[in-house]
């Protein structure tokens, strides 16, 4: 684990009296920023357009036909052990992280009964890679001889600037094809992994994919183990975080979209549908579409170079979540979560009654099961009817006993608001810092100075956004943690030169004060 005091160490414990920050967006990024600021004495107002907090990880209350209430979410979320900053955020409301329960393994299911597992692997590279390659039934000695060793070595040679410089203009599919793995091995070992980032291989940057390999597998000292929340997110995470913030003087405004932001001589004016607020600091912790809409309605935030960066942000293809309340049990021994590949558009199957209290209670009372199906990167031409048929066929193939079960209740969600990491998108991608003092971005679309992804990227960006604003008043930052920023076989540099390069990259990506190969 590495520790980063960004953008600078600071000397004061608390901010000067009278400072006010507005955080637009009550997802993980916004709440992380709000916590760091409120803890240091800044008066914080969080403005969220939905009636619930959490953003894309949020949960809201619905009712079954029986009248029973339940919390619905946008799908399964894994809390990997190297999500250091997200876990620090959660420890503010649960120091022992008792809200989480481990899933020690998750199988990868393929056609014809093929199965891969990541349990029992060594934690560190290259031994985890060697062990996985050795035990997989999808590769023999002849296959290993054909593998492109130089291309495969790039997974162990991760170095931020070099990786994106060399691989951002290549697609993930082009890189994976260059490995020359046999089709079954590629499908079972790589396809599920790459699909989990919502971006299809034919569009995703190979540089981003290599960063993900480094972050989740070859550079991750914690192993491919993750935890899940035992209760719905609203009860276990977001309602407690709201109370935590309110106890520290924060105000949370729900069902209140931000319409525009206006620059003032000494701060900002934030306009909502019902009021205007003045603030010293503003963090825009919004989805890509919401951010772009807000900036289009904020003519004073018109720096052309920066707006070109924010306008370059895109969305990946839609994803679908289908939760089914079924009238009978599944076969004993089924995994709580399984990745799937090679059978239609189905990407994973979650059995909520095996890990979430609310679903477990329902299953115990009724004798049924709560099953959730996910599909990522759904082609735009696929209709909902076609997708439903495809996902159900996949469920029946992998878990044949479900053919005999009836669906008592269902919820179907299809959304398109996840950020794209397309080929060539790294250079223009905005970081947390903006051209305007006191205005920052936060979200999992931001470029960061350390390897990070998904929920961890969101939480880290929010903390960094708060740190940048606190640095103006020499307030001590929230320490940020990450796995090592370089792979074990990254190109060698002289130690002093490497240290200087890393300080330069981290400082200037965070502050935007000087040009850098990975400038924000």
Named regions from a protein language model:
Residues 446-469, 473:
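A conserved FAD-binding loop/helix module that cradles the flavin
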Residues 358-365, 415-449:
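FAD-binding beta-loop-beta segment adjacent to the flavin cofactor pocket
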Residues 2, 17, 256-371, 376-382, ...:
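Mid-domain catalytic core of redox enzymes
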Residues 18-46:
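N-terminal Rossmann-like FAD-binding beta1-loop-alpha1 element of flavoenzymes
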Residues 38-65:
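Glycine-rich FAD pyrophosphate-binding loop
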Residues 86-87, 91-92, 97-207:
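Mobile amphipathic helical/loop "lid" adjacent to a hydrophobic cofactor/ligand pocket
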Residues 211-273, 277-281:
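Helical element adjacent to the flavin cofactor pocket in flavoenzyme catalytic cores
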Residues 1-21, 39-40, 62, 485, ...:
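Extreme N-terminal leader/targeting segments of oxidoreductases
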């Amino acid at each position: 684990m590495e520790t980063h005091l960004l953008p600078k160490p600071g000397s004061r414990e608390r901010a000067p009296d009278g400072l006010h920050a507005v955080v637009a967006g009550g997802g993980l990024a916004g709440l992380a920023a709000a916590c760091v600021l409120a803890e240091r004495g800044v008066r914080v107002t969080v403005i969220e357009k939905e009636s619930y907090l959490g953003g894309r990880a949020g949960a809201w209350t619905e009712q079954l036909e029986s009248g029973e209430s339940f919390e619905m979410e946008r799908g399964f979320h894994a809390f990997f052990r190297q999500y250091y900053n997200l876990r620090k955020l959660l420890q503010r409301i649960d120091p022992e992280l008792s809200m989480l329960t481990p899933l020690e393994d998750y199988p990868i299911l393929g056609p014809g009964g093929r199965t891969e597992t990541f349990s029992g692997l060594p934690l560190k590279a290259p031994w985890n890679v060697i062990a996985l390659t050795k035990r997989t039934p999808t590769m023999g000695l002849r296959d290993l001889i054909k593998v492109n060793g130089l291309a495969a070595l790039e997974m162990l040679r991760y170095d931020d600037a070099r990786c994106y410089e060399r691989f951002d203009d290549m697609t993930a599919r082009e890189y994976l094809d260059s490995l020359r793995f046999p089709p079954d091995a590629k499908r079972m070992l790589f396809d599920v992994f790459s699909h989990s980032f919502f971006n299809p291989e034919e569009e995703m940057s190979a540089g981003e994919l290599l960063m993900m390999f480094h972050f989740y597998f070859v550079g991750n000292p914690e192993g491919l183990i993750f935890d899940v929340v035992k209760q719905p997110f609203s009860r276990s995470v977001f309602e407690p975080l709201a109370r935590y913030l309110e106890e520290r003087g924060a105000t949370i405004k729900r069902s209140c979209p931000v319409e525009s932001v206006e620059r003032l001589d000494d701060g900002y004016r934030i306009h909502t549908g019902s009021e205007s607020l003045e603030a010293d600091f503003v963090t825009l912790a919004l989805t890509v579409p919401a951010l772009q809409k807000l900036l289009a309605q904020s003519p004073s935030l018109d720096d052309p170079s920066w707006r070109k960066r924010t306008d370059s942000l895109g969305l990946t293809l839609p994803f679908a979540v289908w939760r089914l309340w079924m009238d009978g049990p599944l076969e004993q021994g089924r995994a709580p979560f399984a990745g799937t590949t090679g059978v239609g558009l189905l990407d994973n199957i979650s059995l909520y009654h095996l890990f979430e209290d609310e679903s477990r209670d329902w299953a115990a009372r009724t004798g049924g099961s709560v099953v959730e199906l996910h599909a990522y990167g759904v082609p735009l031409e696929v209709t909902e009817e076609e997708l439903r048929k495809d996902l159900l066929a996949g469920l029946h193939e992998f878990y044949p006993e479900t053919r005999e079960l009836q669906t008592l209740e269902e919820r179907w969600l299809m959304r398109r608001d996840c950020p794209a990491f397309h080929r060539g998108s790294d250079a223009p991608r905005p970081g947390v810092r903006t051209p305007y003092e006191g205005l920052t971005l936060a979200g999992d679309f931001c470029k960061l100075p350390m390897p990070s992804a998904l929920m961890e990227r969101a939480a880290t960006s929010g903390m960094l956004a708060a740190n940048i604003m606190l640095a103006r008043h020499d307030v001590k930052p929230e320490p940020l943690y990450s796995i090592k920023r370089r792979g074990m076989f990254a190109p060698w540099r002289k130690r002093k030169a490497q240290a200087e390069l890393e300080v330069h990259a981290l400082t200037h990506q965070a502050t935007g004060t000087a040009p850098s190969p990975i400038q924000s």
